[in-house]
Amino acid sequence: MSLILALLLQVGPNPLSGGLPDDTLVRDRPARSGVPGEDGSATSAWLEQCFSQIAEDPARAHTMAQIRRNETKGADRVLANHCLGTAASELGLWEDARTAFIAAREETPLDETRARARFAALAGNAALASGDAEGAITWLIPAEADARAADAAALAALAAMDRARALVMLKRGEEALEALEAATTLAPERSEGWLLKATLLRRLERLAEAQTAIERAAVLAPGDPQVGLEAGVIAVLTGREAAARASWQSVLVLAPGSPQAITATDYLAQLGDAEETAAREEDSPPS
């Protein structure tokens, strides 16, 4: 048991690591208020084509967007950079993605705060994915501020979550927790914020609070294998091995063959069989 405890406390599942652009950020189109009707329709059609091309051939979409960016201006150029950044993200070209999203933000009118927030968040996320935590924070702070100004709570929460990830990378755990408090306040219905909060609290050894957060995540996303994995880790660290076993076994049912299932299988093997678990719990003093 002590070996498992040490292993899980140090490692465990880590949804706090740098991530990829959230689909709600990528797919939500920026405003085109300055584009006349006919041109707006053409712009919209081009953007749909470019996004469809990303799914089929991201390298070709990347080239299409580069050409479009170089040949256009105004709203057309903003949307070309949007697609360019998304294609670059799909290809793992994080610096290209960051540059494109920053350009899209800088060319978006100041009064279109929601679009500017989105592009800043995407730039920050690209920086995070490349391992540049400081660079990520540079863009995630204005992303959150602009999203709040636009009354876009979900978008502000996403920026706060990525800011928390960046702060964890910089070993600034308490600041990261503040960011996650903001995220769960802004978007209490999103399970991801509660999962990240539970994971960070567990790593800070604040296990009672971690349990509360993971229970909330489980209510919001009962079918999320990452939630089940984290719930099991918190359970074993608080001496509830039977509960940990149940959580990890649920991961095998929810997502067989997934990375989470592979991790759960490894944890279950370390835990031993059910009879050994029951015997250990009977021998343990009440908490």
Language-model segments: residues:
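N-terminal leader/linker segments that initiate helical-solenoid repeat arrays
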Residues: 5-83, 276-287
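Register position in tetratricopeptide repeats
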Residues: 90, 122, 129, 162, ...
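Residue-level recognition of tetratricopeptide repeat
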Residues: 50-51, 86, 125, 165, ...
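Terminal, low-structured helical/coil segments at or just beyond the last alpha-helical repeat
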Residues: 23, 245-287
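Canonical tetratricopeptide repeat
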Residues: 83, 122, 155, 162, ...
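Helix-start (N-cap) detector for alpha-helical repeat units in TPR-like alpha-solenoids
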Residues: 43, 78, 117, 154-157, ...
